[in-house]
């Protein structure tokens, strides 16, 4: 009898390990692509001869498609239950569309190429967040440990691409990005297939009823302002550092340090959930984000200050994203989970990120990169007010740990 009871236990353990690595794999490659694009794409565009406003507009397309694509694909995922197939479609078409970059089109042609490949690429993550949380089942506290492999992928690519670009022209960047797209495609086909089509899933209340909740409005507004504040960082941080005399390898290492801090945060996040409320952690993270933008604006010529400001990425992205994913899981339920993740991606990373990129472009064009980061600090100050006044946890859930069970 002992032998018979042991076998299922080992089988479940092995199955859990396999699922963990399959889930982690796509995060690695998805964020590896971000590691190739965010730090260096603006430098590539600058090398192509585009102006600061043109660079801001092109970088904003990465965010613009997040407004539409996640909502459309999230709705399809909730409607059909075929999230894995949709992820695979987005990976394949996104990779094929990226090939248009090699034609070296002018401004509007490149914008069209970027709109197409980011439309399909940006559809992947919100769908995959749902796949991951469902794949983890009742053990959702392991989300941070799965998601941290995305940070590992980001760091690996940032460091590798930065080292290569110190030896070759930045014009070669698309050739360095292409293998990462291939990694996304391969990892998408390693995800276990959908277990049948689910036409309609149970959920608590209507989507409209959830969206009119004051706390939910505050949640989206808080994240919208947070992503506006990141516009200068994602668009001009590398150019800002280059203006202060940092090499491409050093720029890559500074980006990597921020994500390394994010990994550390993901590892300990479950402990923070157990001790503090969502509102407490959000207020602390936003305050540290405000400090980060001020330090970058005023003290980028001091390396130790930059090192410290990059460690604060654990707060400005890591803590806020982990909290937001769990918040949506607690508020939107199973029936609206995909649409909740899509709205989070579209309204915050999409609309907020695009507006932040454009606004920072005008500030950099007229006044320089330092003032753009002061604009980021102002946006965070408003986010702090919103969070302090109106943000509350989902009903009956005093902490994120409870909402994750």
How would you name each of these model-derived features?
Residues 2-17, 191-225:
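Juxtamembrane intracellular "pre-TM" segments in multi-pass secondary transporters
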Residues 45-46, 76-77, 148, 163-168, ...:
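Interfacial helix-cap and linker-helix signal at transmembrane-aqueous boundaries
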Residues 163-180, 361-380:
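A membrane-interface helix-boundary motif in multi-pass transporters
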Residues 14-63, 216-254, 321:
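Helix-loop boundary and gating motifs at the non-cytosolic
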Residues 102-114, 297-309:
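Helix-loop junctions at membrane interfaces in 12-TM secondary transporters
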Residues 68-82, 165-166, 265-278, 364-365:
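Helix-to-loop junctions at the C-terminal end of transmembrane segments
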Residues 85-99, 280-295:
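Structural signature of the two symmetry-related core transmembrane helices
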Residues 115-149:
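Cytoplasmic helix-loop-helix junction between adjacent transmembrane helices
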């Amino acid at each position: 009898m002992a032998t018979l009871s042991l076998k299922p236990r080992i089988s479940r353990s092995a199955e859990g390990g396999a699922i963990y690595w399959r889930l982690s794999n796509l995060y690695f490659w998805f964020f590896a692509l971000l590691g190739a694009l965010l730090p260096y794409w603006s430098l590539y565009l600058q090398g192509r001869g585009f102006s600061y406003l043109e660079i801001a507009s092109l970088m904003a397309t990465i965010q613009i498609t997040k407004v539409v694509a996640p909502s459309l694909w999230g709705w399809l995922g909730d409607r059909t239950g075929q999230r894995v197939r949709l992820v695979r479609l987005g990976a394949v078409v996104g990779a094929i569309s990226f090939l248009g970059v090699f034609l070296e089109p002018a401004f509007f042609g490149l914008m069209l190429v970027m709109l197409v490949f980011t439309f399909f690429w940006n559809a992947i993550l919100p769908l995959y967040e749902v796949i991951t949380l469902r794949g983890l089942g009742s053990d959702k506290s392991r989300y941070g440990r799965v998601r941290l492999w995305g940070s590992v992928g980001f760091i690996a690519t940032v460091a590798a691409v930065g080292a290569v670009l110190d030896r070759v022209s930045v014009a070669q960047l698309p050739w360095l990005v292409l293998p990462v797209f291939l990694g996304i495609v391969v990892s998408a086909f390693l995800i276990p297939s959908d277990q049948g089509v689910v036409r309609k899933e149970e959920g608590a209340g209507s989507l409209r009823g959830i969206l009119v909740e004051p706390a939910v409005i505050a949640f989206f507004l808080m994240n919208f302002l947070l992503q506006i504040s990141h516009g200068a960082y994602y668009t001009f941080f590398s150019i800002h550092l280059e203006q202060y005399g940092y090499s491409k390898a050093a720029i890559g290492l500074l980006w990597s340090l921020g994500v390394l801090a994010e990994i550390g945060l993901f590892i300990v996040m479950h402990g923070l959930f157990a001790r503090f409320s969502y509102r407490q952690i959000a207020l602390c993270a936003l305050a540290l984000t405000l400090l980060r933008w001020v330090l970058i604006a005023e003290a980028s010529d001091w390396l130790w200050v930059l090192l410290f400001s990059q460690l604060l990425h654990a707060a400005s992205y890591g803590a806020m994203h982990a909290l937001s994913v769990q918040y949506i899981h607690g508020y939107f339920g199973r029936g609206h989970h995909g649409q909740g993740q899509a709205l989070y991606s579209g309204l915050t990373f999409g609309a907020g990120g695009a507006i932040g990129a454009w606004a920072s472009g005008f500030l950099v064009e007229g006044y320089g990169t330092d003032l753009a980061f002061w604009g980021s600090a102002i946006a965070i100050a408003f986010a702090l007010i919103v969070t302090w006044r109106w943000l509350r946890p989902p009903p009956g859930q005093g902490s994120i740990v409870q909402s994750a069970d």
